[in-house]
Amino acid sequence: MLPTRMLYDFQTQTFLSDGVLSPIELIRRAVVNGYSGLAITDHVGAGGIEPLLERLREDCHIAQEEWGIPVFPGVELTHLPPKLISSTAQRARDA
């Protein structure tokens, strides 16, 4: 017997950064295309981490409840001065 295929994508973006789909539409398309799980990792700088993650969490929760797919909200930190990377990453983890 062949193992069940599991398909995940942990590096996706929505129109909240440089993607073209809303978070819920990105998730819906992943479900339709047979994905087992997803992470949404929109680009963000030092500002805006908390509002972005709050927005993503809501759609991730809806996806889990309605479609049974685990979706993990995250951020991809971009264009930060090197001295801010550590503290900004900690803020993202704490958010």
PLM features: what roles do these ranges have?
Residues M1-L2, N33-S36, D59-A63:
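A broad, low-specificity signal for short, low-complexity segments enriched in glycine/proline
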